[in-house]
């Protein structure tokens, strides 16, 4: 890790600690420091959404900020944990948005969601259904919560295997193995759900 990256990690950790201790300005400083990275995560998640989605990456980051305001009392450890939680919150925002749209339509047919079984990242089709993925992840959580965390960190937050291993306190080898199993399980679930 370069000195600049290390310094930024230290800055992020310090801001997270200040924020959790009640410093209201720390969240603003944190978002200023991490806005571009949060927006990149949001853009990655929005690429998986249907064309014409009413949210855009900027709106998603702004919604994230509003939800983070309520998370001040969480125990924040480091930059990687922050991005894991931010990615999970963005996913929840998209799920809530999709559910609200579906309720407004009074129904709607689910869309086929495909995951690239051979790819490193289980990329939901750009026209994928965030609700189908969320439902599948909830079923997986009942079986193996660790695999859900790995999917959240790798797929939604875009963390590397090494970063994911660090956040979870596991070896990269274990994370790779669990990542493969989780992708295969999710792929199978989404295939069954679409048939």
PLM feature spans:
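Intrinsic, short, N-terminal disordered tails of RNA polymerase sigma-factor systems
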Residues: 1-195
């Amino acid at each position: 890790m370069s000195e600049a990256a290390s310094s930024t990690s230290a800055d992020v950790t310090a801001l997270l600690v200040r924020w959790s201790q009640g410093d209201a300005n720390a969240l603003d400083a944190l978002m200023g420091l991490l806005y571009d990275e949060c927006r990149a995560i949001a853009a990655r998640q929005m690429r998986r959404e249907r064309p014409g989605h009413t949210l855009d990456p900027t709106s998603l980051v702004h919604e994230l900020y509003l939800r983070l305001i309520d998370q001040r009392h969480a125990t924040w450890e480091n930059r990687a944990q922050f991005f894991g939680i931010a990615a999970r919150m963005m996913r929840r925002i998209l799920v809530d948005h999709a559910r609200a749209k579906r309720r407004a339509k009074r129904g709607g047919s689910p869309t086929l969601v495909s995951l690239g079984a051979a790819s490193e990242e289980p990329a939901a089709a750009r026209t994928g259904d965030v609700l189908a993925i969320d439902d599948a992840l909830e079923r997986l959580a009942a079986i193996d919560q660790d695999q859900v965390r790995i999917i959240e960190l790798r797929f939604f937050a875009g963390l590397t295997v090494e970063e994911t291993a660090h956040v979870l306190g596991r070896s990269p080898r274990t994370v790779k193995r669990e990542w493969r199993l989780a992708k295969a399980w999710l792929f199978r679930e989404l295939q069954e759900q679409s048939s």
